[in-house]
Amino acid sequence: MRTATKTRVTAETSIELSINLDSAAESTIATGIGFLDHMLTLFAKHSRINLNVKADGDTRVDAHHTVEDVGITLGICLKEALGDKASINRYGSTYVPMDESLGFCALDLSGRSYLVFDAELTNPKLGDFDTELVEEFFQAVAFNTGMNLHLRVLYGKNTHHKIESLFKAFGRALREAITINPEIKGVNSTKGVL
């Protein structure tokens, strides 16, 4: 089974996270940050990954450490659960509309970490959530998974809708990339390793 569990404790946060890449069972997500919980729930649904997260962070300061550390821990678990990446598609891409907004994600589980984030998030806050943390989250995921991740909002007006389209697109593109393809023998690379 392609699963992973990680507990990550720092002076700023305590994160418990588990994933099962091959189960769409209902996820349990409690980060203490309502907007992040909402986005992770959407990600889990659209990736068809069972995701369980419990986070306790120094949110009295702000949400930055918790958001980043959840991203780090998710990336570590994705990397572990993918193992040697044998027979996975490796690549995934999709567009996702959310009302007036259109989000795009393309990714490569190459082992080489990179993030391109092109999204004009015009509202700096959604409730208490700093929208600049969306990029921080995806940076942490990409760099700890070993993923080349491109995210773009092509257009839109509502900042919530823009961010939601990105999380859904990320989930759907990741599902495509992690799907095992019986036509792929070994890893999907001429190098023989990812």
UniProtKB/Swiss-Prot annotation:
Pathway listed: Amino-acid biosynthesis; L-histidine biosynthesis; L-histidine from 5-phospho-alpha-D-ribose 1-diphosphate: step 6/9
EC primary class: lyase
SUPFAM superfamilies referenced in this protein's UniProt entry, alphabetically: Ribosomal protein S5 domain 2-like
Keyword field: Amino-acid biosynthesis, Cytoplasm, Histidine biosynthesis, Lyase
Enzyme Commission numbers on file: 4.2.1.19
PROSITE patterns: IGP_DEHYDRATASE_1, IGP_DEHYDRATASE_2
Gene Ontology annotations for the cellular component aspect, listed alphabetically: cytoplasm
Subcellular location: Cytoplasm
UniProt name for this protein: Imidazoleglycerol-phosphate dehydratase
Organism: Listeria welshimeri serovar 6b (strain ATCC 35897 / DSM 20650 / CCUG 15529 / CIP 8149 / NCTC 11857 / SLCC 5334 / V8)
Gene (UniProt): hisB
